[in-house]
Amino acid sequence: MKCSKCNKKAVTFIRYNGTYLCKQHFMEYVEKRVRKDIRKQGLRKGIIAVALSGGKDSLVALYLMNDLFGKHKDKELHAITVDEGIAGYRQKTIEIARKHCNFLGIEHHVVSFKEIIGLKLDEISKIRGELGECTYCGVFRRLCLNKKGNEINAKTIAMGHNLDDVSQSILMNFVKK
């Protein structure tokens, strides 16, 4: 398929409006949506923390926030990575996050479940009862982000959630009830 704007090869299709976009126009589309959301939310002066898992969505959020605010004198970017304590899982993405923060010159903070709640997710999974790990993980991850954000005096925590993430959370919560 061809890009709806320039006739180059399309790399994605935006379902809700029926638009095919090439790489360049997709990047412009995402940046425009992020800028619109930021204007709507109204970011304050001070520290903006980016929740950084080391995955593609949070890395895109980090780079976009750096492009938008990296040179602002009234805003300072930090990144926060949460280590849930899952053996063999998080160390690789922590290193990816650290590498990108070093490259961009952004201060990187790692906070762990163990540090904040006293248990790793692996330990929680052994004593969880009827509820699955996902129930605890999302709540504790947000708690860790908020605690570290408060500790570094962040005024805002930016997250790289996409519509699929939001939809999945809503559906999971609906199914659990």
What are these regions (language model features)?
Residues 2-176:
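ATP-dependent adenylation/nucleotidyltransferase module used to activate substrates
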